[in-house]
């Protein structure tokens, strides 16, 4: 009988890499050689084995299991881990919004026989930024000289942090400091700054920075930079300039994407130049740029603003023909226009057909339908929709619910009113905000004392009566 061949660290690394289930990978890591003839002999893991399992566990947010592997790595003194492994671990903790664990990992790196440099510090700063821990970022910056000189990545993280926290002038000061210290800015640097300037309506400064990044610093603008500038120009009504920038991007061999075209189409529609949209769509086709869901939603919105439900519906059908899946925004816009032009049957049919089309209605969908049916005095249908939305955990707008109850009271629809009270009882019995709408509204109508008794009994049983207004 031949001897059982033991699993090598090379073989284990291969098995771990091919295992898609992180839990199964962890089980394999814990017991890599179950048929070993000497179970007391510890398995000799390679650095690659540790790297693969750490990546799988961190990417799946299995942080407790990750801690177990890290502890094993710490005590495995044969292995000298590379810094990039800890950079990845710190990034995983940042994505998981675990700043204390990220800090702890960085502080413990020397115990793993790994020297810290500005690279791992950058990972820590990035993780803290993701967690919104700006003060802790400042604390760590005070000791940056221990790990080396700040590089472009360091400045990019800090500039992004200032921009995100609303201190944009500080971001510009960091850029000046960066240049003085002869740290070359990157495309990320300029992208963050130009986006911030555009957001702050400082379009002239943003355009100058776009000019300087190429002429002074030799960094080519990206499609994202052009997107920020074109959007900002459209917002201030500079459509001609926006189109010139789009042409400039093509001249610079930058492929303009659907997001830029969507911005331009939206701006043309808002400016009352809808007749020019077809030319933009033709250009997109010529340039090989396919419209995406956002582009089609912009077109749908344009038709909905003009109350042209037929054209909006045609765009919806075209999306499906082109292999694009309309999203809930697409449907909500068309539902809205159907109700505005009093096409209740078409709206109800589309709403009911959404799940079959692969799109589940959201809170806004239900509110649009409920509000539309109420305005159309379709009380029975509105009560059914209200019951369904409450069952799914959605709530109507306070003012619309108040108006619905008022209309039911005024029209004497007591049977429907009773069903509505029953629905509210099941759906949001403990919601004082909703009951505070119902009681004063219903108390105005003397003919519905039975309904009021039912309502008050419901509140006594399930709601905070002390918070309720009295009749």
UniProtKB/Swiss-Prot annotation:
Q: Does the keyword Zinc-finger apply?
A: no
Q: Gene3D superfamilies annotated for this entry?
A: Tetratricopeptide repeat domain
Q: Which InterPro entries match?
A: Pentatricopeptide_rpt, PPR_P_subfamily, TPR-like_helical_dom_sf
Q: Provide this UniProt record's keywords sorted from A to Z.
A: Repeat
Annotated protein name in UniProt: Putative pentatricopeptide repeat-containing protein At1g53330
So what family is this one in? Answer: Belongs to the PPR family. P subfamily.
- Name a biological process GO annotation: embryo development ending in seed dormancy
Name where the PPR repeats lie: 46-81, 82-116, 117-147, 151-185, 186-221, 222-256, 257-291, 292-326, 327-361, 362-396
Query: Taxonomic lineage per UniProt?
Result: Eukaryota, Viridiplantae, Streptophyta, Embryophyta, Tracheophyta
Function statement: Involved during embryo development.
According to the lineage, what is the superkingdom?
Eukaryota
Species of origin reads Arabidopsis thaliana (Mouse-ear cress)
């Amino acid at each position: 009988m031949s001897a059982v061949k033991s699993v090598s660290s090379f073989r284990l690394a291969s098995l771990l890499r091919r295992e898609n289930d992180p839990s199964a990978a962890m089980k394999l890591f814990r017991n890599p050689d179950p048929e070993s003839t000497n179970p007391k002999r510890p398995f000799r893991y390679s650095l690659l084995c540790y790297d693969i399992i750490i990546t799988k566990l961190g990417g799946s947010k299995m942080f407790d299991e990750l801690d177990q592997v890290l502890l094993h790595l710490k005590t495995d003194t044969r292995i000298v881990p590379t810094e990039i492994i800890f950079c990845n671990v710190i990034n995983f903790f940042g994505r998981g919004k675990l700043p204390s664990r990220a800090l702890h990992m960085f502080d413990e790196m020397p115990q793993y026989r790994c020297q810290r440099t500005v690279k791992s510090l950058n990972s820590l700063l990035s993780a803290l930024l993701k967690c919104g821990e700006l003060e802790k970022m400042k604390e760590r910056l005070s000791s940056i000289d221990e790990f080396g000189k700040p590089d472009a990545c360091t400045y990019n993280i800090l500039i992004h942090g200032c921009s995100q926290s609303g201190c944009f002038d500080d971001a510009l000061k960091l850029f000046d400091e960066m240049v003085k210290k002869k740290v070359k800015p990157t495309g990320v640097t300029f992208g963050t700054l130009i986006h911030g300037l555009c957001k702050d309506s400082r379009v002239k400064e943003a355009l100058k920075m776009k000019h300087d990044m190429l002429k002074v610093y030799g960094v080519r603008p990206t499609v994202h930079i052009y997107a920020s500038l074109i959007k900002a120009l459209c917002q201030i009504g500079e459509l001609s300039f926006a189109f010139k920038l789009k042409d400039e991007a093509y001249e610079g061999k930058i492929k303009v994407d659907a997001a830029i075209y969507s911005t331009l189409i939206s701006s043309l529609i808002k400016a009352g130049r809808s007749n020019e949209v077809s030319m933009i769509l033709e250009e997109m086709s010529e340039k090989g740029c396919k419209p995406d869901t956002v582009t089609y939603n912009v077109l749908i919105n344009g038709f909905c603003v003009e109350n042209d439900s037929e054209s909006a519906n045609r765009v919806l059908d075209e999306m499906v023909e082109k292999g694009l899946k309309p999203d809930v925004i697409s449907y909500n816009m068309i539902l809205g226009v159907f109700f505005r032009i009093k096409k209740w049957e078409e709206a109800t049919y589309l709403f009911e057909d959404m799940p079959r089309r692969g799109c589940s209605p959201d809170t806004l969908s239900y509110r649009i339908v409920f509000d539309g049916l109420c305005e159309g005095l379709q009380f029975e249908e509105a009560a059914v929709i209200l019951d369904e939305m409450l069952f799914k955990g959605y709530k109507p707008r306070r003012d619309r619910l108040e108006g619905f109850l008022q209309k039911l009271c005024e029209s004497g629809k007591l049977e429907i009113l009773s069903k509505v009270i029953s629905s509210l009882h099941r759906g949001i019995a403990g919601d004082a905000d909703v009951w505070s709408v119902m009681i004063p509204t219903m108390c105005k109508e003397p003919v519905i004392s039975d309904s009021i008794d039912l309502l008050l009994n419901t509140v006594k049983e399930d709601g905070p009566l002390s918070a309720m207004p009295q009749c």
